[in-house]
Amino acid sequence: MLLGCDISSISRIEKIYKKYGKAFLDKFLNSHEQALIKSPATLAGFFAAKEAVSKALGVGICKECSFFDIEIYKDSKNAPKLRLSARIMENFRIKTSALSISHDGNFAIAVAVLEK
């Protein structure tokens, strides 16, 4: 089992978004993920989630694992879920994944669990 955790400042992510707009979103979210963003808290949570997955893999965001190898979607109960690229699933031998995102005050935290 692989575990990764990340925390992001909602105000910091909001400040970057206000400065760069959609160009910032395009750096780490696909169009489906962008459609799910309803608030700065959600945006910070998605950023933290992708960082948490990359940490669980032990590589961070890099050539081996880009932001776009990790997709976040919502299930029928609006809970966040992960969809990893075939490249990640194969290279890291990942069988299942779980994701939790939470917000409190000015922070978003994400925990990713990957099972080999």
Role assignments for model-derived ranges:
Residues 1-116:
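Core catalytic alpha/beta fold that binds nucleotide/phospho-ligands
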